[in-house]
């Protein structure tokens, strides 16, 4: 997410911004990888992790570190909001025929990455994703938004309270729908409602230690959802 005047942007930044304008939901991002993905083996339960940079960064160091030996697929895209994620849900989740999807989204909406957004708008987009998954018999783990007390690229938003409020309704919605709620927030938040530096150096994106804290929480939620 670039916040620089056009005359100060590098050629690479300008090219990326142009590509993002032409493909707003970034439907091209995983198209090749989706085609190359091997079919689900009999008896195997594929899990798609679906989200933004927090999800994408989890697998950035290579699949050998992204839940090694597990049939888990990473479909995170940096900077995305729930509106963008909803538009690519068919090709990046449903078409992959997973048994389960882990949805982690909302923080970029609060940051205003694609313009002003209300909590109701975030809820609507997440509800739509859940309903699409349910219509295709895909089990759902709905994750809390991670703690954040400030966005480096959008200072002054004061997101901590907004994140807490959103997580409150996400938990209630998960209970109402019979979904597994994956609570990263409670396990990771500090006294300021954010992430300590050892968990996220920039206050938003987890460090290896941050992801290490998330792994057992995610695994437990997946096991619970698959057992239902």
Regions found by a protein language model. Name each.
Residues 50, 75, 182-184:
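Hydrophobic residues at beta-strand termini and immediately following loops
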Residues 17, 23, 43, 51, ...:
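Short linear sequence motifs
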Residues 1-48, 60, 65, 96, ...:
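N-terminal secretory targeting modules
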Residues 22-27, 77-81, 159:
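Short, flexible loop segments at the rims of nucleotide/cofactor-binding pockets, characterized by
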Residues 64-71, 80, 86-228:
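Alpha-helical cap/lid subdomain in secreted, periplasmic
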